């Protein structure tokens, strides 16, 4: 399978993926991000959201979409800071992991969805607001290329069926990368291909009519 598909399964598989099996951010979790340090980060974000709302002319129905919201730590901090933009607006937490969604806060204009595609946006009538994410793009699945004999080739992952390999999976080198990569292929070097991050940015931008 492509390396990107393997990373996707390791992180987000609904049965055995990292997040579905208890992996999380926080002081008692596996890693720490700014929202878990304390409420100050959320207060700063709330002020920035108000600045964006003001710049748009204080529209009613201002919508804040937080992708990869986890258990809602940032949402809690932002809401506690009482930003003016949310007095008549809404804050939508987008989180693909059902285990994390169950721990999110509710009420006070907060709602939750599993994906950006689940937002009720009609074609030609996008949201007015902000789509944001904290440390998401560097946590999306990515492809991997390796330079072999002057050519970038795709790194694949397969099941290790022979008894001499102690790991259940192993990497193999596949076909030449397509489209070609504009980086000199120094023998043995590797580079990530983050096409998923680009797709996410395009999808996020498509949600907004202004913001």
Where are these regions (language model features)?
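Class I S-adenosyl-L-methionine
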Residues: 5, 123-211
């Amino acid at each position: 399978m492509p390396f990107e598909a393997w990373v996707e399964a390791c992180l987000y598989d609904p049965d055995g993926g990292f997040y579905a099996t208890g992996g999380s951010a926080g002081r008692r979790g596996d890693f720490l991000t700014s929202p878990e340090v304390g409420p100050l980060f959320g207060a700063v974000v709330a002020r920035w959201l108000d600045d964006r709302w003001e710049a748009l002319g204080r529209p009613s129905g201002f919508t804040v979409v937080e992708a990869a919201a986890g258990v809602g730590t940032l949402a809690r901090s932002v809401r506690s800071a009482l930003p003016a933009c949310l007095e008549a607006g809404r804050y939508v937490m987008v989180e693909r992991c059902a285990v994390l969604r169950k721990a999110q806060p509710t009420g006070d204009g907060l709602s939750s969805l599993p994906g950006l595609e689940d937002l009720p946006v009609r074609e030609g009538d996008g949201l007015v607001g902000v789509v944001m994410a904290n440390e998401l793009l560097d946590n999306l699945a990515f492809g991997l290329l390796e330079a072999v004999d002057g050519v970038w080739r795709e790194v694949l992952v397969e099941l290790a069926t022979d008894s001499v390999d102690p790991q259940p999976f192993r990497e193999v080198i596949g076909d030449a990368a397509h489209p070609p990569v504009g980086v000199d292929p120094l023998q043995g070097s590797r580079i990530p291909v983050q096409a998923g991050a680009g797709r996410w940015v395009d999808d996020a931008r498509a949600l907004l009519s202004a913001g």
